[in-house]
Amino acid sequence: MKKNNSIKIIFSLFLLLIIGITGTTLIAQDIDTTKIKNKEFNENVVFYPQHQDDEILWGVSAITKAIEERGADNVYIVLVSDGSGVNVFTRNPIFTKIPRKEKEKLRNNEFKAALQELGVKDKNIIILADEDNKLGTHYELMEKTILKFEQELGSVTHIAHHYKYDDHIMHRKNGEVLKRLRDEHKIKDARYFMKPKYVKDIPEEKREYYKSETEEERDKAKKAINQYKTIDVNKGKLGIGYTSAHSYFDNLYKDPNYTSVLSVYWRIRRLKIFNRLWFYL
């Protein structure tokens, strides 16, 4: 009996080793591309940035392309968090006595100004903190909003943060909401913002690159980015976005095409042969 158990353990370890060695091959052979239209958005496009500035840092050119392809009436931006917990507010003493709602307003001033430069319509900007009437982040309402868009509009491309390849826990939770709904087949087209340093972790055939290539596109992108750097006290703009994430903004400024990279939805599935082998262990 002990001998049989030892054999099973050895065989299990061997099987795991084989799976690890062939992992890359399995990924390449088992990518679900049937419902993905590469670099083509569905009739309606909804972006779900977690914080004010995420839509620009990771999606400025993607938003421009979405509007060009589907029209401004069919492109929506859904802000998931109120953004009032950004490090600028906690580290700079001038903000200590400002109410949280006022901090949110300061961030939204930059957010709305940036989207206006890109041509996003005011009626298509949805701030979940306003709808939920509570502070913080709003993952449950995000899920309801995703499902509402899917059910009411039918042909929708949903874009959130990546559920794994992101160094911000709130971004990953944001992406997990979208991934779960796609895993459960409740939505058809899910894609994810990619920070530049994680692009290498995504298979090449699952990456989408969006660039601002014309003078008009580049002008729009730069003006949108500048809204997070501009200081204009009279308009309630204090350059909060740039101050809190200046290195990310500087990298984007250095890119002449203001490139946005998205990852399309994909899953790794175990091959049937491994399921059968596992059954006999």
Give the role of each language-model region.
Residues 1, 100, 260-263:
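Helix-centric, low-specificity signal for extended rod-like, repetitive segments
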Residues 1-15:
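N-terminal Sec-pathway targeting helices
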Residues 11-14, 41, 47, 76, ...:
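Phenylalanine-focused residue identity feature
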Residues 15-22:
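Hydrophobic core
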Residues 22-25, 241-243:
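Compositionally biased, intrinsically disordered low-complexity regions
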Residues 23-184:
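Active-site beta-strand->loop->alpha-helix modules in alpha/beta enzyme cores, enriched
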Residues 110-118, 122, 186-281:
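The feature marks non-catalytic terminal segments
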